[in-house]
Amino acid sequence: MIRKSLLFLLLGLTLTAGLDQAVKYWVMQNMPLGTEIPLIPFLSLYHVRNSGIAFSFFSSFSHWGIIAITIIVIIFLLWLWKNTEDNKFLMRFGLVLIIGGAIGNLIDRIRFHHVTDYILFYIDDIFYFAIFNLADSFITLGVIVILIEELRTWMKAKRDSNHTSSH
């Protein structure tokens, strides 16, 4: 019988990577490269290709170098997930978001030699944030969830330590 935690991992990875790929497919099929679709005053869909990693970092690395780095990171994160206690739900949830996002972008790199990005935040002609995709959002959200969980754990340990030392 498959453990609940493994089922959670597989379902989470399938949902995150699958949703990312579905949106990218829609963008590639319906928006020519360089096309912008304004959604609301500060948010547009804008179809671009990114040969680097986050915010075009490592764009000078070879295609296979970026794929190798991504696979190594995914393996390490899976190891972390496996070695995280079952009761640390937020930690595991954050790891699933990060791994799923990494897999979504890895699929693009293997298939197309680039990642499709399409989310653009901006303020008129004053400020433009880096264009990114849903996989990047999952990765960022996963990091935030893990940081919140770690902060929560640290604060609880500090409270418990203060409580026991005052007696």
UniProtKB/Swiss-Prot annotation:
Active site annotation, chain numbering:
D117, D136
InterPro entries linked to this entry: Peptidase_A8 (IPR001872)
Q: How does it sit in the membrane?
A: Multi-pass membrane protein
Does the entry feature the keyword Coiled coil, yes or no? no
Q: Where in the cell is it found?
A: Cell inner membrane
This enzyme catalyses: Release of signal peptides from bacterial membrane prolipoproteins. Hydrolyzes -Xaa-Yaa-Zaa-|-(S,diacylglyceryl)Cys-, in which Xaa is hydrophobic (preferably Leu), and Yaa (Ala or Ser) and Zaa (Gly or Ala) have small, neutral side chains
Please list the coiled coil stretches.
Answer: none
Q: What is its EC number?
A: 3.4.23.36
**Major location (coarse):** membrane
The keyword Hydrolase belongs to this UniProt entry's keyword annotation: yes
Its function, per the record, reads: This protein specifically catalyzes the removal of signal peptides from prolipoproteins.
PANTHER family xrefs: LIPOPROTEIN SIGNAL PEPTIDASE (PTHR33695:SF1)
Instruction: Report what the protein is called.
Output: Lipoprotein signal peptidase
